């Protein structure tokens, strides 16, 4: 018994920390939304992002990068600021890395209406 108690006391020190991945919780505009040209596109993640390893592209219906859409990382938010977008379908292709250093990728589309 004298040997078991010290060993049990050390168990919490051996367990690694529990990390969650940086999952996309929601976006503005939402996936499949039909909106007027947005002034910004905001992605809300489940944890703060590592700015050096996270980012996004805004693509038009032909898969071309829409220029002028800088990306800002602010904690769990990823914000794209495109210029005025003509009507059409757009796709946001994102990748995120949280504090656990695991990369997640995803995308969603929305439509800019006339």
Task: Identify the role of each PLM range.
Residues 2-8:
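Sec-dependent signal peptide recognition
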Residues 41-66:
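Short, surface-exposed alpha-helix to beta-strand junction/turn motifs within ectodomains of secreted
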Residues 10, 15-17:
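N-terminal signal peptide c-region/cleavage motif recognized by signal peptidases
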């Amino acid at each position: 018994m004298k040997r078991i108690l010290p060993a049990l006391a050390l168990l919490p020190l051996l367990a690694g920390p529990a990390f969650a991945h940086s999952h996309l919780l929601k976006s503005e505009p939402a996936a499949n939304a039909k909106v007027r040209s947005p002034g910004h596109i905001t992605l809300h993640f489940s944890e703060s992002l590592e700015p050096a390893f996270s980012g996004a592209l805004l693509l038009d219906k032909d898969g071309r990068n829409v220029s002028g859409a800088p990306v800002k990382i602010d904690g769990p938010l990823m914000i794209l600021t495109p210029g005025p977008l003509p009507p059409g379908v757009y796709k946001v292709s994102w990748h995120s890395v949280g504090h656990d250093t695991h990369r997640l990728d995803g995308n969603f589309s929305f439509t800019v209406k006339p």
